[in-house]
């Protein structure tokens, strides 16, 4: 019953299902263990499936809180054999490669950051470290730059020098005046 509830709540697709849910009352955390459904993956892959090499150790991703408890998704990621015999890790549908946070957590962190306009306050509200929020900002910025139309990115560019508290430390601020947007990747 409990696993069905989380299956519907997380909506991870048919290739992944909830194995079990553990609650640690001492540290107020919920771990949702997710299992890879190999048979479903085989059906979907057809001729491109060449076997599972092994499974990585459990990885843990921070997810949106459930009530007042921190929530984490834990899963063993399968390493598959490619057609050419090389081994690769399967991408998970809830997070980017190498990320320790789910897409939903990152999106919520950005929403909170836009509301607070303060990284420290955002990290306090989400009960995570300042570095976590900083990493999420940089990852979101990089994804945004990749989605931009490259043909309009450099048609017109303004550059401004800003000093910090009159102590002669300057920051160069590139801006796209036509769109009113700052561009940190010039």
Feature names for model-found ranges:
Residues 1-90:
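Short, conserved DNA-binding cores of transcription-related domains
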Residues 32, 43-46, 82, 109, ...:
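Mobile genetic element proteins and their domesticated derivatives, centered on retroelements
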Residues 32, 102-117:
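Short, amphipathic alpha-helical "recognition" segments used to contact nucleic acids or chromatin
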Residues 37, 127-128, 162, 177:
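An acidic- and aromatic-residue-enriched active-site/binding cleft used to recognize and process polar
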Residues 41-43, 91-92, 121, 167, ...:
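Short helix/loop capping segments that flank catalytic or ligand/cofactor-binding pockets
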Residues 86-107:
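Short, Lys/Arg-enriched anionic-surface-contact patches
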Residues 120-136:
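Short, basic interhelical loop/turn and adjoining N-cap
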Residues 135-186:
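RNase H-like nuclease fold core
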């Amino acid at each position: 019953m409990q696993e069905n509830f989380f299956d519907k709540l997380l909506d991870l697709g048919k290739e992944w299902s909830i194995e079990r849910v553990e609650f640690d009352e001492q540290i107020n955390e919920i771990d949702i263990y997710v299992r890879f459904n190999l048979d479903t993956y085989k059906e979907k892959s057809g001729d491109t499936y060449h076997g599972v090499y092994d499974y990585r150790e459990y990885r843990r991703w921070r997810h949106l809180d459930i009530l007042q408890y921190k929530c984490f998704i834990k899963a063993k990621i399968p390493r598959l054999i490619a057609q050419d015999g090389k081994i690769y890790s399967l991408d998970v549908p809830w997070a980017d490669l190498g990320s320790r946070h789910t897409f939903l957590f990152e999106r919520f962190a950005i929403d909170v950051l836009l509301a607070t306009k303060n990284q420290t306050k955002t990290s306090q509200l989400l009960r995570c470290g300042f570095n976590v929020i900083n990493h999420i900002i940089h990852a979101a910025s990089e994804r945004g730059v990749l989605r931009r139309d490259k043909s309009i990115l450099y048609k017109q560019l303004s550059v401004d020098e800003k000093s910090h508290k009159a102590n002669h430390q300057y920051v160069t601020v590139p801006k796209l005046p036509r769109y009113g947007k700052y561009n940190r990747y010039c």
